[in-house]
C-alpha cells in the first residue's frame, strides 16, 4: 500500500499542463467516415438544386424573330433629257448616221452610257445617240474629268469601235484615243469625207463586168469557128487536089514500071485512099472541136499544118522501098567498070554504093555487096 501511495503522492506534487498545451486529439476512423458522408450529402444537395433550376416547368416561350427592315430611300431618277450642245447632231452627219445604222444596239451601249450616264433601252438607244449634239459642260470641268476617267477604263478595242462610229481615226495609244473622242464630243462636226460605198453595189458592179466580159468572150468564140470552117474547107480542097495529082503520078509510074510491081501499086493506092478518107474525117472532127476553146483551136491549127506538110509530099516517095539485090548488082557493075581495080578498095566501093542510095541504111547489106564484088571480079 505504501508503494502505491508513493507515486500518487508524487503525482499530486507535479503541476498539471495548461489546456492550450494539451496535444490535439486525433479523430478516430468512425469520425472520418461520418465527415465524408456529410460532405457527399452536401454535394448531392447542390447538384439537385442545380438540376431543379435547369428544369423549366410548363411550355417554353418562343422568341420573336426580329427582322431587319432596310428603309432605303427610293432614288428618284432624273427625267431623261437631251441637252442641247454646241455642235451638230450626230444623226445629221451623213457618215456617222451610216455607221450608226451598221452597228448593233449592244455595241452602242457604252457610247450611250458615256453620253447620258445610263445604258439606255434597246428601242431608244440609237435614236438617243443620234440626237446628241455635244456636252453642255466646258473643257477642264469636273464633269469633263469624270468622262475622261470613264473612257480610260475602256479597253482599246472599245475605244476603237467608238472612234469608228464617230468617224474618227482609230490609230494611236489609248490616251490619244480618249482625247480625240472627248474633243469631238465637245463639238461634233462632219469630217467632210464621202460616204463609203456599200459592198452590195460593188459586188453587183463586178457581176456586170463579169457578164459583159462573158458576152465578149462568147462573141469571140462564135467568130472563131467561122474562120476555122473557112480554113478547114480550103484545106479539104487542097487535099483533094493533092490526092488527084498523086493518083495521076501513080498512073504514070505504073505505065513506066514493069507489070510485076502493079499489084504492089494497087495496094499502095488502097492505102492512100483510106488515108485520104481518114484525113477528111479528121478535118470534120476538127470543125466541131474548134468551136469549144481557143486552146483546142491553136492545137488544131498546128496539127493541120503538120498534116498539110505531110500531104504535100508525093505518094511515090512514101511508097519507095530499099533497092533489091538485082539493083545493087547493077550499081556495083557500073562502079567496077568505071573504077581502076588496082587502086580501088572494097571500102571505097561500099561507100559509093551507099551514096547512090542515101535514103536507105545499107549497112546490114554490106556482106552482100562484098560477095557481089568478089563474084564480078573473079
From Swiss-Prot:
DNA-binding region(s), chain positions: 340-354, 370-374
Biased composition (Basic and acidic residues): 20-31, 50-65
Short sequence motif Nuclear localization signal: positions: 207-223
Phosphoserine PTM positions: 20, 33, 53, 74, 123-124, 161, 203, 206, 212, 229, 232-234, 245-246, 253, 290-291, 299, 304, 306, 309-310
PROSITE patterns given in the database record: DEK_C
Subcellular location field: Nucleus
Listed name of the protein: Protein DEK
Location of the region described as Disordered in the Swiss-Prot/TrEMBL record: 1-65, 186-329
Record carries keyword DNA-binding: yes
Disulfide-bonded cysteines: none
Biased amino acid composition, Basic residues: 196-205, 261-280
GO molecular function, one term: DNA binding
Residues of the SAP domain: 149-183
Domain of life: Eukaryota
Presence of the UniProt keyword Nucleus in the record: yes
Keywords on record: ADP-ribosylation, Chromatin regulator, DNA-binding, Nucleus, Phosphoprotein
Gene Ontology annotations for the cellular component aspect, listed alphabetically: B-WICH complex; contractile muscle fiber; nucleus
ADP-ribosylserine PTM sites in chain numbering: 282
Species for this entry: Rattus norvegicus (Rat)
Bias kind Low complexity: ranges: 281-299
Matching SUPFAM superfamilies: DEK C-terminal domain (SSF109715)
InterPro entries registered for this protein in UniProt: DEK (IPR044198), DEK_C (IPR014876), SAP_dom (IPR003034)
PTM: Phosphorylated by CK2. Phosphorylation fluctuates during the cell cycle with a moderate peak during G(1) phase, and weakens the binding of DEK to DNA.
Bias (Acidic residues) ranges: 32-49, 245-256
Quaternary context: Found in a mRNA splicing-dependent exon junction complex (EJC) with DEK, RBM8A, RNPS1, SRRM1 and ALYREF/THOC4. Interacts with histones H2A, H2B, H3, H4, acetylated histone H4, non-phosphorylated DAXX and HDAC2. Component of the B-WICH complex, at least composed of SMARCA5/SNF2H, BAZ1B/WSTF, SF3B1, DEK, MYO1C, ERCC6, MYBBP1A and DDX21. Binds DNA.
One Pfam family in the UniProt entry: DEK_C
Lineage start: Eukaryota, Metazoa, Chordata, Craniata, Vertebrata
Protein purpose: Involved in chromatin organization.
